[in-house]
């Protein structure tokens, strides 16, 4: 085995490693399925929460309708959906995620279903500030089960720092704010930030829905 | 002076842009979050949403998708099926996509 062969093995091994990493990060490279499916409505089902923070899932659930409604989609009312699913005997989010998409879609006559999983949500208290780190996965699936779009977002959030004021008052403010953040982390700003990064990402633009002003132009050149 | 005026103007323009979207969502996000975690706030949350929907109707603006149905569900979970059906009908009238789901809810409620 010459140098070249060894180099080839190394390259292959390396690319396997790299692709191995890529697999854990769910990504859709092409929007072809999305464009073909052209969903008009999105059913956001209850959020699966793998963290121990019970408010993490409700903060994600309550901030998604606006995000997607403003993209031009009809978004099924999340609390009404949750109530109806509970009447149907599906009381845990994991149970809902396990139902075949076609079944869920037909129950609501939805064009697509958004599944969100919170992989982690941790708040760390370090001297005078609390940092919350989250890891959230989003998957949009068509009524027939085809994956239309996916993203996974990891981000950190800390309360705003205070640049004005004396060192002492800044320190005091930070301590007070950190205590508040620890008692009740600032859920909604954090999840809004995560959602915005996902749905308004310029590198992976989420297509507009039928109520968005740019909808017809967007689909004009799509097959 | 002129600089500060233009900064004010710019800030005004920017904040104007920030609030302009397809819909006015009122306090929907924060209120629903409160509804889940502060059971004592339920009455206030329901009242606030109904007032928001009244304001939208008075302005002739279409409410954001789902908000009429959410008001219906708040009433339903308080035991007021009649008010729930009324809001579900309004959601169905405003949003064709919601009609099958609203029909299911209305049929179930009227059967009981």
Where are these regions (language model features)?
Chain B
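Bacterial Sec signal peptide processing site at the extreme N-terminus
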Residues: 11-34
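Residue signature of alpha-solenoid helical repeat architecture, marking inter-repeat boundaries
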Residues: 23, 62-63
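The tetratricopeptide repeat
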Residues: 66-67, 102
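Structural register within alpha-helical repeat arrays
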Residues: 70-71
């Amino acid at each position: 085995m010459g140098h070249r062969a060894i180099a080839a093995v190394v390259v292959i091994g390396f690319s396997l490693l790299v692709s191995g990493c890529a697999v854990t990060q769910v990504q859709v490279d092409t929007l072809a399925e999305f464009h073909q499916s052209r969903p008009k409505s999105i059913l956001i089902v209850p959020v699966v929460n793998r963290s121990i923070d019970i408010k993490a899932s409700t903060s994600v659930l309550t901030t998604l309708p606006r995000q997607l409604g403003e993209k031009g989609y009809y978004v099924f009312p999340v609390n009404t959906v949750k109530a109806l699913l509970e009447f149907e005997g599906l009381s845990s989010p994991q149970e809902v995620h396990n139902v075949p998409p076609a079944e869920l879609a037909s129950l609501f006559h939805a064009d697509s279903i958004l599944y969100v999983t919170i992989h982690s949500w941790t708040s760390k208290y370090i001297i005078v500030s609390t940092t919350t780190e989250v890891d959230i996965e989003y998957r949009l699936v068509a009524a027939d089960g085809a994956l239309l779009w996916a993203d996974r977002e990891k981000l950190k959030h800390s309360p705003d720092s205070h640049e004005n004021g004396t060192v002492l008052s800044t320190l005091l403010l930070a301590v007070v704010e950190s205590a508040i953040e620890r008692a009740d982390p600032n859920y909604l700003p954090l999840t809004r930030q995560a959602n915005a990064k996902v749905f308004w990402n310029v590198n992976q633009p989420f297509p507009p829905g039928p109520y968005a002003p740019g909808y017809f132009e967007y689909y004009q050149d799509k097959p | 002076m002129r600089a500060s005026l233009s900064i004010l103007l710019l800030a005004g323009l920017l904040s104007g842009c920030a609030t302009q979207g397809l819909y006015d969502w009122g306090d929907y996000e924060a209120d629903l979050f409160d509804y889940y975690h502060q059971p004592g706030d339920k009455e206030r949350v329901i009242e606030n949403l109904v007032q928001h929907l009244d304001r939208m109707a008075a302005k002739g603006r279409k409410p954001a998708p789902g908000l009429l149905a959410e008001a219906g569900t708040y009433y339903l979970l308080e035991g007021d099926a009649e008010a729930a059906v009324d809001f579900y009908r309004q959601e169905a009238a405003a949003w064709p996509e919601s009609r099958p789901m609203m029909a299911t809810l209305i049929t179930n409620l009227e059967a009981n």
